[in-house]
From Swiss-Prot:
Keyword Repeat attached: no
Keyword terms, alphabetized: ATP-binding, Chaperone, Cytoplasm, Glycoprotein, Nucleotide-binding, Stress response
Transmembrane spans: none
Family label: Belongs to the heat shock protein 90 family.
Cellular component annotations (GO), alphabetically ordered: cytoplasm
Role according to the record: Putative molecular chaperone that may promote the maturation, structural maintenance and proper regulation of specific target proteins.
Name assigned to this protein: Putative heat shock protein PS1
Amino acid sequence: GVVDSNDLPLNVSELVSNASDALDKLSSSPCVLVSGKFWDNFGKTZTVEVEDDSAEAKTLSKFLNAALTDKTEEVVRNWKLMNAAELLSEINRLSSSEWQAALR
């Protein structure tokens, strides 16, 4: 769902935005109800994704999608526990191929 900024009060503080009719309607819409706890977690989650059409986008996107609901230290620790060696080899491969292309 998209909320038009004209429908929100000018002073969009947490209390005011929580009391807004537009947000109440959005939070009870069928698409939100279907997704379960999406609305509860919305706003606490930030997603980083690959925004490139290259063949490597799918490979890297599984590593770069991260819910940043934890403290930064916890996110970094979790990233290290993920297949870090595989991620680094992909990044090195991409970097070296792009570097070689740049030298041509």
